[in-house]
Design a protein with these regions (language model features):
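Beta-strand-turn-beta hairpins that frame and shape the catalytic cleft
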Residues: 1-4, 100-110, 236-241
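N-terminal active-site segment of His-dependent metallophosphoesterases
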Residues: 1-65, 72-79, 151, 158
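Active-site neighborhood of phospho(di)ester-bond hydrolases with catalytic His/Asp-centered motifs
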Residues: 5-7, 28-33, 63-69, 94-98, ...
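Active-site environment of divalent metal-dependent phosphoester hydrolases
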Residues: 10-16, 36-39, 70-80, 100-103, ...
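Short amphipathic alpha-helices and their capping/turn segments at secondary-structure boundaries
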Residues: 17-22, 53-57, 95-105, 125-132, ...
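Glycine/small-residue-rich loop that forms an oxyanion/phosphate-binding "nest" at active or ligand-binding sites
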Residues: 75-96
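Binuclear metal-dependent phosphoesterase catalytic core
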Residues: 102, 198, 204-222, 229-266
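Active-site-proximal loop/helix segment associated with metal-binding centers of metalloenzymes
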Residues: 109-185, 192-195, 200-201
Length: 266
């Protein structure tokens, strides 16, 4: 099976960016941050940009989708979660948030994952771990306060994001523990390992908002696809190949490594 991987298209700022199906792909995986309605969004329509990938509207292969973080910008979290799922159902796109799907003897296990903000804390001495998490919280909240995401009537900040991440992690651990006689592919938006960290920034407190340290889960999959960081990844760690193919922002010079028709085989 050949999987075309796309993420971090940010169609809200580049709505005219055209993406074409890879001619040899059997499946398209969208690993989040496809389009949003953040302040100043230029995205037309109400389908988060997903309509252009609809198998019911001409996309030639099945499509799996895990939402990113930006889909929730400037909106209420739970209402938008339901709206995204309904949008996928209407467009014939397979929703993969905390879902497992088997296609041609390949198991796809997906979740946005979010961040527990402990990726760097795990490297610290026990007495310093909480301080490291608090630094990561502060770095994240500086940005999260600008997104406008709310949940239960309150701004959705780092502590609440961590709670959601722990829910996703628990689900993922349980899903991967289910025996499967075949190939397992994990799809997340947030990265599973600091090995995916953006080399432009290194391991700073903000990195814990992009990468988790779930390296112990890597041996449970043959392939792990993710997004979120605007730099490509393609490495093998603990027997698992980890791949990201984000578009990113043209204005930040992040698109040079993007490969529109990139496919990974399993």
């Amino acid at each position: 099976m050949k999987i075309q991987l796309l993420s971090d298209l940010h169609l809200e700022v580049q709505p005219d960016f055209l993406l074409r199906p890879a001619p040899d792909a059997d499946l398209l995986v969208l690993a989040g941050d496809i389009g949003s309605y953040q302040y100043g969004s230029r995205l037309p329509g109400a389908d988060f940009g997903l309509e252009r990938f609809s198998p019911l509207r001409g996309w030639p292969v099945p499509v799996l989708y895990v939402p990113g973080n930006h889909e929730y910008d400037a909106v209420e979290f739970d209402a938008t979660h339901a709206r995204l799922r309904d949008t996928c159902e209407r467009l014939g796109i397979t929703w993969l948030e905390r879902e497992t799907v088997v296609m041609d003897k390949v198991r796809f296990v997906g979740t946005t994952l979010w961040s527990d903000f402990d990726a760097l804390a795990q490297q610290a001495r026990p007495a310093q771990q909480l301080k490291a998490r608090e630094k990561a919280f502060r770095a994240a909240n500086w940005y999260l306060r600008t997104t406008g995401t709310t949940r239960h009537g309150a701004p959705w900040l780092a502590e609440a994001v961590r709670e959601q991440a722990l829910v996703c992690q628990q689900w993922l651990r349980e899903a991967l523990a289910v025996p499967f006689d075949g190939t397992t592919v994990v799809v997340t938006h947030f990265a599973p390992s600091l090995h995916s960290a953006d080399p432009r920034y290194g391991n700073v407190p903000g990195t814990a908002g992009f990468c988790n340290a779930l390296d112990e889960l890597l041996p449970l999959a043959s392939l792990w696809l993710h997004g979120h960081l605007h730099c490509p990844s393609n490495y093998v760690h603990r027997g698992c190949r980890v791949v990201a193919n984000p578009l990113g922002y043209a204005g930040k010079g992040e698109q040079q490594g993007f490969r529109e028709r990139f496919c990974v085989a399993v």
